[in-house]
């Protein structure tokens, strides 16, 4: 693990509660797609955030931070970023990084800002094998929570093997994507998951339900199921 001081070079409010933050570390860094960093608030308080950028992007790290009055944990980090324009991070962390089996079909599952985890893996996987069979399921309460959907749709035009499945719980009139939960959408679309590598970014309870359902009902291999939550459940 490396501790780095980072300059905050840009902060973009993507939605009312989600910020795209770019930081530039003061020294060389490395990580694997799908790993996360820890923002050091003090010696005993370190807070995890997935890196949305890829390991090949050497000049900066991109974070997607969902900060609101109901998520004071992340809001405190954003308050520091906006006040000090610099942060200290520990990097890298996590074992749910992209594996090298480039021919296996892949499923990425993310809710909300969990997309940052999926984005790093997706872009890295496409760089390695532009024709890989990849399906990304991105869920949110409302359409606005799928804040980078246009980027994904543009990628799908360039990569015929990429399928983008947006899912919202509370659709507005005119919504053309799926309705409900991402896990239900995966189960509806796949009779078997035995040959897939599956990467999941979500709450512990969602990850546990996914593991139980995918393995028992769709023959997913537990050793090909990846997510930071699985280190704790």
Swiss-Prot record:
Principal EC category: oxidoreductase
Entry keywords, A to Z: FAD, Flavoprotein, FMN, Ion transport, Iron, Iron transport, NAD, NADP, Oxidoreductase, Transport
Keyword Repeat: no
Record-level Gene Ontology MF annotations: enzyme activator activity; riboflavin reductase (NADPH) activity; riboflavin reductase [NAD(P)H] activity
PANTHER family: NA(+)-TRANSLOCATING NADH-QUINONE REDUCTASE SUBUNIT, NAD(P)H-FLAVIN REDUCTASE
Superkingdom of the organism of origin: Bacteria
GO CC field: cytosol
Organism for this UniProt entry: Escherichia coli (strain K12)
NAD as UniProt keyword: yes
Described function: Catalyzes the reduction of soluble flavins by reduced pyridine nucleotides.
InterPro entries xref list: Cbr1-like_FAD-bd_dom, FAD-bd_FR_type, FNR_nucleotide-bd, OxRdtase_FAD/NAD-bd, Riboflavin_synthase-like_b-brl
Binding site for pyridine: 111-115
Subunit structure: Monomer.
FAD-binding FR-type domain location: 2-99
Stated family: Belongs to the Fre/LuxG FAD/NAD(P) flavoprotein oxidoreductase family.
Enzyme nomenclature, EC number: 1.5.1.41
Protein name: NAD(P)H-flavin reductase
Reaction(s) the record says it catalyses: reduced riboflavin + NADP(+) = riboflavin + NADPH + 2 H(+); reduced riboflavin + NAD(+) = riboflavin + NADH + 2 H(+)
Gene Ontology biological-process annotations: iron ion transport; protein repair; response to oxidative stress
